[in-house]
């Protein structure tokens, strides 16, 4: 059985992120307005909307890199070798040594970035921490969907990472 990251999965990730943002729109708006009003580094123009877009772009790049590095560290802890890359606008970490991992280990690898970054942001209790938490959570929707898919599989199964997703063995 295989899990393939397809256009359908990307749309599902976008929809989940959209629903979350729609439900939390007031909180999210307050956090971003606080970010651009209280931190001079993010106040680049006199238009809040443009400042918010710039802040999102500036913060998304290092958050994404850290997210993928955490995946890589988790793979390494379980004996894998990784390569990092980009496919379109998406960054990815891929296990390249062919190691086959128990389902539980693979779920830990999938969820390690959202877990560690979220916990770290509890220590930064200001709007920057909130924005980093939010952007990482939204960027982790694919990992969460894959973990949910795996949790439904046999608990004794093994996973082989593939370029297109993963195989359940």
Stretches with model-predicted labels:
Residues 1-36, 89-169:
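Metalloprotease/metallohydrolase-associated module, dominated by Zn2+-dependent proteases
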Residues 32-50:
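Perimembrane loop-to-helix junctions flanking transmembrane segments
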Residues 43-45, 81-82, 157-159:
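Short secondary-structure junctions
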Residues 46-65:
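Short pre-active-site segment immediately N-terminal to the catalytic Zn-binding motif
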Residues 55-56, 67, 101, 131:
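Generic hydrophobic alpha-helical membrane-segment signal
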Residues 63-76, 113:
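Active-site recognition of the HExxH zinc-binding catalytic motif
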Residues 65, 82-94:
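Hydrophobic, membrane-facing alpha-helical anchors
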Residues 71-83, 153:
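Catalytic Zn2+-binding segment of zinc metalloproteases
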